[in-house]
Amino acid sequence: MANSQRKILVTSALPYANGPIHLGHMLEYIQTDIWSRFQKLRGHECHYICADDAHGTPIMLKAQQLGIEPEEMIAQVNKEHQQDFADFNIKFDNFHSTHSVENRELSGEIYLKLRDAGFIKTRTISQLFDPEKSMFLPDRFVKGTCPKCKSEDQYGDNCDNCGATYNPTDLIDPKSAVSGATPVMKDSEHFFFDLPAFENMLSEWTRSGAIQDEIANKLAEWFEQGLQQWDISRDAPYFGFEIPDAPGKYFYVWLDAPIGYMGSFKNLCDRREDLNFDDFWSKDSTAEVYHFIGKDIVNFHSLFWPAMLEGAGYRKPTSVFAHGYVTVNGAKMSKSKGTFIKARTYLDNLDPEYLRYYYAAKLSNRIDDLDLNLEDFAQRVNSDLVGKLVNLASRTAGFISKRFDGKLAKIADTTLEETFLAKQEVIADLYENREFGKAMREIMALADIANAYVADAAPWQLIKDEAKQDEAHQVCSNALNLFRILVTYLKPVLPKLADDVEAFLQFPLTWDNLGADLAGHEIAKFKALMQRIDMKNIEAIIEASKDNLQATTEAAPEKKAKKSAETADVAVDTRSPLESDPISDEISFDDFAKLDLRIARIAKAEHVPEANKLLKLQLDLGGETKQVFAGIKSAYAPEDLEGKLTVMVANLAPRKMRFGMSEGMVLAAGPGNKDLWILEPHEGAQPGMRVK
């Protein structure tokens, strides 16, 4: 057990109640569940709570499309979400809904405290209004032509093509996405939360270590531009909570959504006599509160939410942990390619523990995106879990049952056990700091040691020699003891496997009994614990996830189908980068072969005071360091680059600049200014590797 018991409340971001869970969502819930299970394994009081985010215009409109009431729809979605989570072995202490009595009461209470303290302001604003549906239109429910690049069919807040942000009123030829009608301008009184009043507190809190440095650096832009009052109201019709003393006005979904953390925990406390809500949420609480979220919602959790809590007299979160997005096979999830995979589709074909392990093996405490490479996924699971971990037991357990009455021997040489136990605090620290990938590497390195031990000892040979029965008994018992330690270390990641191993070993796997002496202990007969992934199962997932594009083609016959790549050129999308920056003239392979492209880690990045566009980078090639001046200052802060892997031209002739010598070039994509992205290789790549 850990030195002293901590009181911890941990949350994941609330899934929106208008659709199913997919594998992009699952990253966060798996990450949080692993961390929560680890805390409990260490003996801490840890409560993992969540809820469906059940309010807002999208839910109201989706229910209308289905011809049912929003309450009916969110109840059905809640049931589906809970089943998906349960089948992925996500163990919430409570999963609730923001459309609850507890959340209504807490939202009203917090709002009134903010209002009475002078933090709520009102003013009249003009918004686009759908005259056919008699409703004001949120940003994402207005579409039109981008005022910057003139791309059609863009949302009312930003352009998917050029990345520009703007107001819905800036769109050219705007249309309601609800009815197709041309919206009109209409005035309405709105309620605003006075976020600027908390600027000093937020400036200090965001630099206190409560959030990752990358996030703090990003939020610095908000402070540089000056915090603005936050619109927290929406007009009827709207599915949500009506604002106290304001008929026809509703809380914006992002006001009551984070309060849903409190509402879900209040619901749990009301059902348990041993839990007190104020112990975790009062201003003077000594408990720890952690939020796991995606990097796309950091502004809500790291600015608006702590300010609301501060203004209403509650404690702020201990930390907010953000993670990156999930890509599949190096690209954004795609319905047409079958890589937009729903949790249920995955569960119909593969063991959830496979994905839990793969995500854990690639997760760090940074906000880098995680790529689910499906071939690598199969290879890593088959190699690590089946080939290394489970194989350790399958190669030795049968001998214990058949030759030694199922009983383990007293281990004479405990050298290996001591090596394994010496890693427990290293592994614990990695779990604690959310460095799951590093923890998995430590554990698999131990698995390699154990397998090498068994291979060298060859109990299948020893067992044939009557004079070496004791030695065979020792080897098999030692191997199973090492296997027990490994599975205990992996228990937060692989809870179902751990349950099965506990049944097989007939012994509980806890952190406290890692060093237990199992001499004379009887185990059950070994049964297969895990099967290898067959690529046919992955192919089945992809096929089941593909959209039926035939209907789309038939519904729009006036749109010509693209010609076969074998018979004609593929037309260039007018919004494609190829349109403005065509492919260069062909070069010979010999010309290309002259380039020496290498993986490099950005060891250090710093500003060049004399240059407006350059950053000075120290690139580690795994034994050699090169200095490069890169024109990426408009897109990156130096601190956001340090530690990242990238690709560089390593054999470019050094170029003397007035700031110093540049010894190569890093590769980046994009048109320029803020739209630049350095190339980041798969995390399996190592500094110094050649790109070929």
Swiss-Prot record:
Compartments, record wording: Cytoplasm
Note on how the cofactor is bound: Binds 1 zinc ion per subunit.
Sequence motif 'KMSKS' region, residues: 332-336
Family: Belongs to the class-I aminoacyl-tRNA synthetase family. MetG type 1 subfamily.
Gene Ontology molecular function terms on file: ATP binding; metal ion binding; methionine-tRNA ligase activity; tRNA binding
Subunit structure of this chain's protein: Homodimer.
Protein name: Methionine--tRNA ligase
Motif, 'HIGH' region: chain positions: 15-25
Enzyme class: ligase
Catalytic reactions of this protein: tRNA(Met) + L-methionine + ATP = L-methionyl-tRNA(Met) + AMP + diphosphate
Domain of life: Bacteria
PROSITE patterns (alphabetical): AA_TRNA_LIGASE_I, TRBD
UniProt-annotated binding residues for Zn(2+): 146, 149, 159, 162
PANTHER family membership: METHIONINE--TRNA LIGASE, METHIONINE--TRNA LIGASE, CYTOPLASMIC
Compositional bias ranges of the Basic and acidic residues kind: 556-566
Function: Is required not only for elongation of protein synthesis but also for the initiation of all mRNA translation through initiator tRNA(fMet) aminoacylation.
Alphabetical keyword list: Aminoacyl-tRNA synthetase, ATP-binding, Cytoplasm, Ligase, Metal-binding, Nucleotide-binding, Protein biosynthesis, RNA-binding, tRNA-binding, Zinc
InterPro entries attached to this UniProt entry: aa-tRNA-synth_I_CS (IPR001412), Anticodon_Met (IPR041872), Met-tRNA-synth_bsu_C (IPR004495), Met-tRNA_ligase_1 (IPR023458), Met-tRNA_synth (IPR014758), Methionyl/Leucyl_tRNA_Synth (IPR015413), MetRS_core (IPR033911), MetRS_Zn (IPR029038)
